[in-house]
Amino acid sequence: MSSGLWSQEKVTSPYWEERIFYLLLQECSVTDKQTQKLLKVPKGSIGQNIQDRSVGLSRIPSAKGKKNQIGLKILEQPHAVLFVDEKDVVEINEKFTELLLAITNCEERFSLFKNRNRLSKGLQIDVGCPVKVQLRSGEEKFPGVVRFRGPLLAERTVSGIFFGVELLEEGRGQGFTDGVYQGKQLFQCDEDCGVFVALDKLELIEDDDTGLESDYAGPVDTMQVELPPLEINSRVSLKLGETIESGTVIFCDVLPGKESLGYFVGVDMDNPIGNWDGRFDGVQLCSFASVESTILLHINDIIPESVTQERRPPKLAFMSRGVGDKGSFSHNKPKATGSTSDPGTRNRSELFYTLNGSSVDSQPQSKSKNSWYIDEVAEDPAKSLTEIPPDFGHASPPLQPPSMNSLSSENRFHSLPFSLTKMPNTNGSISHSPLSLSVQSVMGELNNAPVQESPPLAVSSGNSHGLEVGSLAEVKENPPFYGVIRWIGQPPGLNEVLAGLELEDECAGCTDGTFRGTRYFTCALKKALFVKLKSCRPDSRFASLQPVSNQIERCNSLAFGGYLSEVVEENTPPKMEKEGFEIMIGKKKGIQGHYNSCYLDSTLFCLFAFSSVLDTVLLRPKEKNDVEYYSETQELLRTEIVNPLRIYGYVCATKIMKLRKILEKVEAASGFTSEEKDPEEFLNILFHHILRVEPLLKIRSAGQKVQDCYFYQIFMEKNEKVGVPTIQQLLECSFINSNLKFAEAPSCLIIQMPRFGKDFKLFKKIFPSLELNITDLLEDTPRQCRICGGLAMYECRECYDDPDISAGKIKQFCKTCNAQVHLHPKRLNHKYNPVSLPKDLPDWDWRHGCIPCQKMELFAVLCIETSHYVAFVKYGKDDSAWLFFDSMADRDGGQNGFNIPQVTPCPEVGEYLKMSLDDLHSLDSRRIQGCARRLLCDAYMCMYQSPTMSLYK
């Protein structure tokens, strides 16, 4: 978007003589001429039109000589004036402007703007109107009554309209005001029973909700464009020799490079006549041309059938090139029921698979008026659409649904006239959209074998758009196809997952639910379309109507009936080696993820799947100072999460949701049931606030008091000389630079990697040391001299980076070696300190070289990539005994489906951990095989345990 921006001290009056407002349709990047700073004006921002450009401003030439620019003063940025192309804005009236300005999030504002019906209803909401209020995202709406409507602060020329609502019934006490805003009483209600909200948080309660049709969020540009002389889907005839042949128009437009010749028409013939493949001069003009039955002729050679009615563009439908209102043509034989889609040139597509039968029936068939059938299931996205009155829109009243033997015996059905854009012909039928056998080359010859009634096993997982069986779907063609998904699966011989859609309207070339001779579902003839699942999108017309289930309340034993896990009362140590491997490995193993729970799933799996170092947390009896829900939390962790995980290798998401709800009881916590969190947040709330776990780490800094904590975050500056650091190096360097020591040897050491947030990593790869020697990091512990191996008496932090003496290692020396080392001229000014030793250190220990080492073993690594946490755990002694866990590895169903956790072996990790640091540094991360790349490149926390402090040893 081309634009210019100025800073103005004061906007003079000629700008505001006429109040015309525009909303930006895309983001604009502009430069402030005074500060030279780049500012972003987001999509959804609102500006007031500048009528007089001569006052204090100079016109900025448009890029590449573009004209028709509009000058705007952005209302949210009072000193910002910019010029934008006309195509990048849409005019809105002042009343809409006031409603939208109250929504501070421009993205949400733009979303509401597209929902014209809801925006229009906002004008009707006034004092006394009953409404529902959305207080928090994802939660239920509370009933209320509007007590105030207007601006909260009338400081600007145009102010946003807010609504003061008194909450009723279950909403009482959930608000935040008694009607006072910034000391001014705008309405009166009880304390905490009122809220001030913008329109996006309100829903008008109506006795009769008949506004479904206009809830379709159409485009902002509704300008009419010239239509071609013949309408797509219209019936035509042509004379071939002595006979008249009929067909359906599938293309009508000028040819590229031959515009002067006028319109050409592509006709899908009723009989196998023609040889046009949809191309002209190598350009694909039509995706539905069949070389067996399609012909391309000049429009003068085409005989249109009688005109039955004047066609108008569908309300709020997207208009494409070649769309208009020249009139439609119909054939005298009965037409198939279907929707009047926007005609126009179809883009090339490989979405559609050939079905069976000819593209147009050879025998005329009487068609019933269209009905749509939707499974009545608890969480069907279309559930709210099933009570639409029969006279909705332009569709004819629905007939009785077909006999139940043609439908699934497992469901009950509702009849629903579905299409928002159907326009009936004079005979009551609906014009249809042909789908010819245009892609036989994709599928090969059709199988004409008898229909099989036992299709291959359906694939239950949806796609990235949350689509599943029962979802309202749209196939983005020109015009689009709309329907409901009846089947998802992978037919034999295909590598693609297909979706079987029952279209809302009949379409030439479609079936009654069969594909390649196999029946996958049952529907009316010419309504079954099979497409690639990835080519489907949620039906955009009903984006604002599809209810989003409350994922918190949905996570219960009823909804998750097929995924429930056991309760185990008996205390269970972790199973190791082969036994543990066999229990834990496979799909539907580990902890099931649900609704942003991966941070919690992976952390719990790391801590308890194959380690007992923290099992004391599960066993400590309740004390008088514990929170009231201490026992509930501990029992839940022990019997419903840890023990079942160790015995059966699986924990259901409902158990984790119980824990998440408990976490939210803590005053310092919020969002644990729904938001993305970090493992350290979870550990702090669980260990410190609820279970009051004894701090895992006791650390002292330079003789100060001991500090307690549960994990240690490594802070350090990046050393360019270090390619791939080890955890040993990082921990020692961090301790030396901060002058820290462990006051006690920890039984469990959780180390957070040096990174900032979820994205920025200090090192591209980190080597997770399998063994951590913390001897030199402990207070009151005998340590070896770095030179002779004797008992160290002094430590010198300044010698740490000295390349001449074991570079990158902590330097402690005996009395003799310390004197020798510091005789060197470059070390003369070093300040070394005495090593603190235990008072009762046996004299013979160090003299006989028996200075003990304190070592810890790596037992788990928590990793993060693109905000998703996964876990690596070690289940045995062997170097290759590694497992990889992902709580959301697979998906069963769409938005209201279920995540399938998975635990997989990853023995390749052991091979990479045997490599030298130099080899790892030179290794391209993209060439690291299997899961090992995530372990080496995405480590977030490394967890170590003392081999001598396990509870069950």
UniProtKB/Swiss-Prot annotation:
Renumbered residue ranges of the record's region Interaction with TRIP: 106-590
Taxon lineage: Eukaryota, Metazoa, Chordata, Craniata, Vertebrata
Residues the record lists as binding Zn(2+) 1: C785, C788, C814, C817
Protein origin, superkingdom: Eukaryota
Protein source organism: Bos taurus (Bovine)
Membrane topology according to the record: Peripheral membrane protein
Single GO BP term: regulation of cilium assembly
Subunit annotation: Interacts (via CAP-Gly domain) with IKBKG/NEMO (via proline-rich C-terminal region). Interacts with TRAF2 and TRIP. Interacts with PLK1, DVL1, DVL3, MAVS, TBK1, IKKE and RIGI. Interacts (via CAP-Gly domain) with microtubules. Interacts with HDAC6 and BCL3. Interacts with MAP3K7. Identified in a complex with TRAF6 and SQSTM1. Interacts with OPTN and SQSTM1. Interacts with CEP350. Interacts with RNF31; the interaction is indirect and is mediated via SPATA2.
Protein's UniProt name: Ubiquitin carboxyl-terminal hydrolase CYLD
Entry EC no(s): 3.4.19.12
PANTHER family: 40S RIBOSOMAL PROTEIN S3A (PTHR11830)
Chain positions covered by the region annotation Disordered: 313-349, 384-410
Compositional bias segments (type: Polar residues): 337-346
Span of domain CAP-Gly: 153-198, 253-286, 489-532
GO MF assignments: cysteine-type deubiquitinase activity; K63-linked deubiquitinase activity; zinc ion binding
Catalysis performed (reactions): Thiol-dependent hydrolysis of ester, thioester, amide, peptide and isopeptide bonds formed by the C-terminal Gly of ubiquitin (a 76-residue protein attached to proteins as an intracellular targeting signal)
Region (Interaction with TRAF2) location: 391-466
InterPro entries xref list: CAP-Gly_dom_sf, CAP-Gly_domain, Papain-like_cys_pep_sf, Peptidase_C19_UCH, USP_CS, USP_dom
GO cellular-component term (any): ciliary basal body
Region of interest (Interaction with IKBKG/NEMO), residue spans: 467-681
Gene giving rise to this polypeptide: CYLD
Catalytic residues (UniProt): C598 (nucleophile), H868 (proton acceptor)
Positions of Zn(2+) 2 binding: C796, C799, H822, H830
